Amino acid sequence: MQYSFTEKKRIRKSFAKRPIVHQVPFLLATQLESFSTFLQADVPATQRKPEGLQAAFTSVFPIVSHNGFARLEFVSYALSAPAFNIKECQQRGLTYCSALRAKVRLVILDKESPNKPVVKEVKEQEVYMGEIPLMTPTGSFVINGTERVIVSQLHRSPGVFFEHDKGKTHSSGKLLFSARIIPYRGSWLDFEFDPKDILYFRVDRRRKMPVTILLKAIGLTPEQILANFFVFDNFTLMDEGAQLEFVPERLRGEVARFDITDRDGKVIVQKDKRINAKHIRDLEAAKTKFISVPEDYLLGRVLAKNVVDGETGEVIANANDEITESVLEKLREAGIKEIQTLYTNDLDQGPYISSTLRVDETTDKTAARIAIYRMMRPGEPPTEEAVEALFNRLFYSEEAYDLSKVGRMKFNRRVGRDEITGPMTLQDDDILATIKILVELRNGKGEVDDIDHLGNRRVRCVGELAENQFRAGLVRVERAVKERLGQAESENLMPHDLINSKPISSAIREFFGSSQLSQFMDQTNPLSEITHKRRVSALGPGGLTRERAGFEVRDVHPTHYGRVCPIETPEGPNIGLINSLALYAHLNEYGFLETPYRKVVDGKVTDQIDYLSAIEEGRYMIAQANAAIDDEGRLTDELVSSREAGETMMVTPDRIQYMDVAPSQIVSVAASLIPFLEHDDANRALMGSNMQRQAVPCLRPEKPVVGTGIERTCAVDSGTTVQAFRGGVVDYVDAGRIVIRVNDDEAVAGEVGVDIYNLIKYTRSNQNTNINQRPIVKMGDKVSRGDVLADGASTDLGELALGQNMLIAFMPWNGYNFEDSILISEKVVADDRYTSIHIEELNVVARDTKLGPEEITRDISNLAEVQLGRLDESGIVYIGAEVEAGDVLVGKVTPKGETQLTPEEKLLRAIFGEKASDVKDTSLRVPSGMSGTVIDVQVFTREGIQRDKRAQQIIDDELKRYRLDLNDQLRIVEGDAFQRLARMLVGKVANGGPKKLAKGTKIDQAYLEDLDHYHWFDIRLADDEAAAQLEAIKNSIEEKRHQFDLAFEEKRKKLTQGDELPPGVLKMVKVYLAVKRRLQPGDKMAGRHGNKGVVSKIVPIEDMPYMADGRPADVVLNPLGVPSRMNVGQVLEVHLGWAAKGLGWRIGEMLQRQAKIEELRAFLTKIYNESGRAEDLDSFSDDEILELAKNLREGVPFATPVFDGATEDEMAKMLDLAFPDDIAKQLDMNPSKNQVRLYDGRTGEPFERRVTVGYMHYLKLHHLVDDKMHARSTGPYSLVTQQPLGGKAQFGGQRFGEMEVWALEAYGASYVLQEMLTVKSDDVTGRTKVYENLVKGDHVIDAGMPESFNVLVKEIRSLGIDIDLDRN
């Protein structure tokens, strides 16, 4: 088994019972693949597939002018390299994007030859089409300097859907069936039955009309309509009664309305008897061809065809007319013998279309189309052209209507056609097929569709959403181009004169900047990033709304299995509308979710893995991943639990066709990180998976001792860690840079064989948490491709580490852990276990005002020297300064207009003669409630404005860092070159050289070492070939130096050019403050099982409950939090964590007494290989075993995968191994070694019962009391009501609401109440009065009129009611 560089350092013992058959796919693949298909940037222009940008261009172009003599054709498009890299865009507040240029061709035809088009001239040109934001390698976008994510949307797939109203519309509870054809874009077409069984259609939810109008509009006559929907009964008219052609199926089950006889007149069925199978057999036996029916049997029947008098050509009766006695008389008079009527019955052949045809008043195709025109455009006169154009545009025009590939596939599948391709517009037979199926449904045949089935909902990813926006922009451009194309020839215009890219840019900008699906990335920790990118939302444009979404849409559906996680979804109004992709889920070409299964043939599991969509899955019998299998892969149980079409059942192994890939297949990333998930209640698991996303990265991340084995995948795929692009040797490493000399076999010829990784240091995330990377390699380490070189936030040795492992005791403690409160030891705070760093960004801009420019300066009047002491000569705070609320960070003055002086000021001015400065202090100060250390400052200056010293210094530092990187690369390149040179030169004969090298001397190593490397090139070699090689190496080194100098110049140019700032801004300064947050009462904490609580007290170490060996507990939790919540997983985690730590202590004890390496190996083998998945420890060298043991001292990490985790027996074994009898006795453990005797820290007395003690991975969540604590004395007031604002962000007050008023009324505190409702709230005059009274020492309140009363009076007056206050 192959271990990576980091895995060797610390192996996680897995309790999994099944081998890994399918690796978890790359977690961000959905986003990255979708966007790369949209751009197709690396595909040559001629080989691009018709998807993404290419599809958008080809769907809109060519654009033809109104007169048809000029057209604009699309040739290809190209994307330029982005001007700034991702980091520069974030610093400067820019969008990371690329310019899109399209090559278009303007073709002008000769107007003189109207019959045959002759090309007069062709102009080809590249035209700028706007900027397209680019995706970062981690699947996000940088828009205006902030990282955003485009969430995928789950929407109803295009196609045709049949449903009924579940009997809710009509009072009788009758099921009303309906069908809807949904295109990707274009008009929706609905068909619906009303309670009277008339079939209607409507376009785009407008007024409904009888469906036969639509059928006539597509060219069918009433006869054809009836022939399409009914079978006919054939009658031969006699002088009395008639003969009915005998069709057995149509008679069975009917009640005979007359005696039915055979040919010989023998009665086979008596009148009023029900016709059964025996009667039919008798009639068939008698070879009956016709049945004689009486006259009244014909009355009320409906004619299927027009009946025409053969001689006169006169129409006697129309199709769909009922037969009456007068009609029969006319038929007999005209000598017509044969007639056809519609066959209908009450059971499975209703007369719906016939009834609809009666309601329909239109006569022919034209009338039907006019009726549709009137419905779509009420009030407009229907001219013939307009009517035709509108009808054709509705469903038949490719510009206005697009079913899409998916829609056509779904449509054809639903109406039972074999081929899945076809035209993208609606065809006449499509409409007919839909109506036929709907009528069949009403007749009781077939099933309605389930709209929550994942075969009927598809995912729209970034690429598709962006393509739709881009197309919308192009369509706007098309309209403008059409107008101008007419003038193209006369005014000799070029393509760039025709195309204005503004509409495209604005459509794209609006989508990425403010669409509902473009969200501010949740960057609290690596898990929250991954989850955000794997999220699937049913909301957004073209989706559902929170208010309209019912229970069914939100519910878990059987087809979610392995596609969408049944656990992870938000609590609250969005529950079930926002979901997360399951671990192995993946999208197929149509956008439907697929999940992998192992193929099973004749009860034997193969290695073949097939991805099935929800529709395909319904056809197979699928076993679960935990089905018992022998070594050959045969299913061993007699009956296997399996699923078919959403139903679970037990079947024999030979019926199984597929099997799940892994037990964790059904859950998402966040849920699969919860150990013992199978023992938690679903609601708590939901909270657990949501709260892991809110865990704040700790100062020193610590891996969970009990994990699930998915932690490494999660950390690596999130992009928080640094991975090696290529293998090699670590050449240099410090806190901020890692330099790797690449292996020769991986280096590309002619390229620099050096990889330099600049680590991210103390950077602010979107949520103000700290992103910091720490190297985990040493100089000289050999690394392979994909190895983790540096840890990021919340990762430890390449594994996700969201919290800390805490020693937990489940026991009450003086009521301090009542109702989920958490009691924490002071030691946890002292050791900085949960200390986190938060970084705040504060901005100040100097603008150009009407009165003159604002200035950033140190020269500010009325400021104490203490305040100015932190600012440098440019007026900007020093890095490293510790600042409190109210301190000045950047000095800024704004010119102010001439002010009117008060008489006192005039007097002072006259005496002292000082002209008051005409600027006011508008410096950037630290906001209230914040303090910290300045860790970075960035200064941006507009083009053409002199940079201050600080800005220049920042640029110089950046260039210095860049030069360091280049020097490192050069050093390694030159080192390699000189090594090759030395190997080549030693032993060669020289013709002369430096240091008086004689001709014919053989060069040796000592001579070369004595010479400066650059003088080696001065050696003249006798061998011409070697001399040429020497020259080539010299040239390649000089070439590299030249390249590096060019790169440095490029960087310098980029840094020294002015910054792009918003209009009117001259200078912008960003100051970054690092705030250290220690754990304190009021902070929210949680485990991974939804067991959340608030810290109630931090207790001194000496008062905490402790064990017999003096070790105090870190956290005391209330045992009552477990049973009612049913999340027993936390207790199991504590037990296994206890074993993990115990094993670590035993290994530590062995290392301390310097036990033999064999003993260590034997103990490690016992841990790793006696149960669960075996590890290959024999492949480790002694040094590696030693390093492994050192890393295991703090606890052997365990992995208990979801649904395939540690059993009770395995846990008991591990506890026995961790706590031999002597240790167990010393700690006074119970026999199963998971409870310990604890002693009260205050009295030293042992507690009466043993206590469950162990280690749990505990998280600190992003709900910190520091961010919520807030107080106000005076502050801003609302303009209209004059009441204080609300909320911390507005520095608002606390609302004194209705209930609080009742409380004061109950106490009879009338004056307090009056004060609350007037001077403390919105009585403006009263407020000033109170202040004056207090200054005078007169403590009296004169309450005036509350402003809200005045607002009420104004509102009543606005209703037209005159109201006045009677002040008497």
Swiss-Prot record:
Instruction: Choose one Gene Ontology CC annotation of this protein and give it.
Output: DNA-directed RNA polymerase complex
- Highest taxon above the source species: Bacteria
Q: Which reaction does it catalyse?
A: RNA(n) + a ribonucleoside 5'-triphosphate = RNA(n+1) + diphosphate
Q: Where is the chain membrane-spanning?
A: none
A GO molecular function held by the record: DNA-directed RNA polymerase activity
Primary role: DNA-dependent RNA polymerase catalyzes the transcription of DNA into RNA using the four ribonucleoside triphosphates as substrates.
* PANTHER family assigned to the protein according to its UniProt record, in alphabetical order: DNA-DIRECTED RNA POLYMERASE I SUBUNIT 2
Q: What is this protein called?
A: DNA-directed RNA polymerase subunit beta
The gene designation is rpoB
